Amino acid sequence: MNSSLPYLEWESKLGNVHIEGGFNYSHGNLVVPRKGKYRVYLQITYEGDQSESCNGEKMVLKNSVFLFSDSYRKDTLLLSSQDTVKCDMHNWSKSLYTAASFELEANSRLWVRSSHPGFIAKNYVFTFFGAEFQTGHVSDT
């Protein structure tokens, strides 16, 4: 996972970006294969300890999933989750999960931003992103 970009890049070969069901993954984006209703989901687990950089008494962790579609042509916030950790905690771990269903157009792109990418857990089992097709017409594009 590349954390130096304004969006997160995922390792599609190890399984932390889920690209089943016709999705393509390209440069941090999940590309929607066809028009329909999709369940979009994201979990990011953060880890750290008090010796790592933390300003103030607490750190606010925030994840966001954005959508870019050809019809709107602007990044739109779809999902967001946030929580806080106290800066004096030793060896802390915090998982943030969010999911919801949306009507998406074919070729729309989903991407993720994290407030603190340097604290994302290195074990891919705890951090994942994807979408599942729920309903729609297979021939719709």
Regions flagged by a language model, labelled:
Residues M1-G21, F66-S93:
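Conserved, structured regulatory domains from eukaryotic proteins
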Residues M1-K35, R39-E52, Y124-T141:
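Terminal (often C-terminal
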Residues N29-P33, C54, S93, E103, ...:
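Amphipathic alpha-helical protein-protein interaction segments
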Residues R34-K35, L67-D75, E103-R109:
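A short, structured loop/turn motif at beta-sheet edges
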Residues Q43-E47, D70, P117:
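Solvent-exposed coil/turn segments that connect beta secondary-structure elements
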Residues S53-N63, V125:
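Short coil-to-beta strand junction motifs in C2/discoidin
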Residues K86-N107:
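Short, surface-exposed tryptophan/glycine-enriched loops
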Residues V112-F119:
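Short beta-strand-plus-loop segments that form exposed binding edges in beta-rich domains
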